């Protein structure tokens, strides 16, 4: 039941990395439009199970179309992964867990969701429009200092303070209500440095990440993975920008290599091992092929990292 209008990035590579077992129990923590879930189901045997999660209303509609007794769907955030699995009494029994982070193409292409500076629509940006403040509402409340912090830390925007002042001042005079209004303001304030990249790219990313608490949710879900996965299970994560990938890379490194021990400390290797045991084994990373990037330019920045649960 794959959405023909949505090209799932690293589709086969991500599912291959899960090393599917016929009778295994798998979680697709970011159902989206069902691309990964459909392929996982095609590789499962009759006794296998797939649990998919998403909070996006359009994803919920797609999931309802998947009529398969091996498939179940949870409407919610993947940051609550631990609680979902505990409620299902499946702790330590999950054979594979997949995350496909960020915003999907259908979300970007739907103007009324307010994610894209390329399509004019209400300035919303919420993954779940029924919860929390929209981007427009938040921008009306935030002060210059806090907005500049978000733009700098979540968008790596060099002109964060200048832009924050302009947004707050504009909202004081005439509230920003649409994506086009915000994009036009950003384009006016920020000098064009890269003609291949819209000046609003970083700011829209930063605001979206903040509105949806994305980075904290990723960290929470990754920590839950260590509790829910069985020995030998796979953890696979597709990320799309450096902030996401840094969290994933550091998490896998931390739980496969262990803490950094300062040189000169009087500790033997046996003492260090007694204090800490690795929980993950790095298996590899994959980036899209040249053909995939040509077919789907949005895949260009993606990277898949995958590891195995050990000990």
From Swiss-Prot:
A single GO molecular function term of this UniProt record: rRNA (cytosine-N4-)-methyltransferase activity
Origin: domain of life: Bacteria
Subcellular location as annotated: Cytoplasm
EC number: 2.1.1.199
UniProt xrefs under SUPFAM superfamilies: Putative methyltransferase TM0872, insert domain, S-adenosyl-L-methionine-dependent methyltransferases
InterPro entries per record: RsmH, SAM-dep_MeTrfase_MraW_recog, SAM-dependent_MTases_sf
Record keywords: Cytoplasm, Methyltransferase, rRNA processing, S-adenosyl-L-methionine, Transferase
GO cellular-component term (any): cytoplasm
GO BP term, example: rRNA base methylation
One Pfam family of this chain: Methyltransf_5
Recorded catalytic activity of this chain's protein: cytidine(1402) in 16S rRNA + S-adenosyl-L-methionine = N(4)-methylcytidine(1402) in 16S rRNA + S-adenosyl-L-homocysteine + H(+)
Enzyme class: transferase
Binding site residues for S-adenosyl-L-methionine: 34-36, 54, 78, 100, 107
Family statement drawn from the similarity comment of this UniProt entry: Belongs to the methyltransferase superfamily. RsmH family.
Role played: Specifically methylates the N4 position of cytidine in position 1402 (C1402) of 16S rRNA.
This protein's name: Ribosomal RNA small subunit methyltransferase H
Organism: Hamiltonella defensa subsp. Acyrthosiphon pisum (strain 5AT)
Lineage of source species: Bacteria, Pseudomonadati, Pseudomonadota, Gammaproteobacteria, Enterobacterales
